[in-house]
Structure formats: structure tokens, C-alpha cells
Amino acid sequence: MTTASLITIGRILLIPVFVTVAIYYAHSVREHATDDRLRIAAIVIFTIASLSDAVDGWVARRFNQQSRLGAILDPLADKLLILAVLGVLCFSDWPVHLPLWFVVIAVSREVLSIAGAFLVDHLVGTVKIEPHFTGKLSTPLQLLTLGLAMLEAERLMLPVAILASIFAFTSGMIYIHEAWKQIQASGQHQPPSGPRA
């Protein structure tokens, strides 16, 4: 296993750590005994996990460590991190105010991309959808939005959230189009023909 893949796995392992610390912080808020040390710890863990996305990509390119495992784990780690943070911020007592439209677009994109990848893999046998620059931009912008939300920097968060949502929506449409083209090329979308007379 490559160093880049190990960094990606480390990012995945940080997700439950973040969730645990974040939930304890939310509990302290609910009990009117807010522990800002937990909030800071959660933000630090989230920041490390987010930055590791750039690190594993750089390591993979710099040391020629691109692999099929890394190509699967890296976007999966990003999606799991985004969904986990959204879940904590939306369904706990964290004092944040994420725009509903940002949450809907972010969750829809991540869920559809995961489900779409499994569907294409099931129907076609392999997924050959290349990352688009809009998707590469939407992920760090979404992570930055979530980080600013946890820092309660709402004025800075809003324009970043708008950009993140535009790129997320655009990349989602592009990936759906590319997936459909791949399914069409395989002939899996055609209904079976009936018996001939």
C-alpha cells in the first residue's frame, strides 16, 4: 500500500474521531456548560482531515503513487467527511446556521455520486468517469464552508457557500451526463427485446 493511500485511510479514520468530539461539544452546549476546548479540538481534527486531501494528492503525484485503490478511497474519504460534518452540524446543538440550499445541494451531490458510481459499476463493470475541474473545486470549497461555519464566520461563509454550491451542482450534472453516456455505450439502458414471432 502506498504512502498516499495510507494518508487517505488516515483521513477516513479521523472522521469518527471528529464526530465523537463534535457530539461531546454539542452535548456541552445543550447542557448549558459549553466546553470550547471540545469545539477547538473538533475544528483542529476537521482541518487536519481536510488538509490531508491535498497532501495525499501531492504525494501521489510527486512520487508516482497513483493507484486504483487511491482513486477509489480519495473521493470516498472526501464524501464521507463532508456528509459526517453536515450530519453533526445539522442534527446536533452546534450553534451554526448553514443555508438549507447548501445542505441540500451538498448532500444530493455526494449521495448521487456514490449511488451513481455503484450503479455504473454494476451495469457496466467499471467506472471510467474522469474527475472534472468543477468537482475538484467544489470539494475544497464545501470543506471551507463547513470550517467557516464551525468558526461562526457567517459573513465569510455565505459567498464561499454560494460558490461551492454552484460548482457542486455543475459537477453533479456533468457526472450524471458522463455516467449516462457510459451506460449507453455499454447497451445496458436498452430494454430486452420481446420474443419474435
Residue ranges: model-predicted function:
Residues 1-197:
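Alpha-helical transmembrane bundles and membrane-interface segments of multipass inner-membrane proteins
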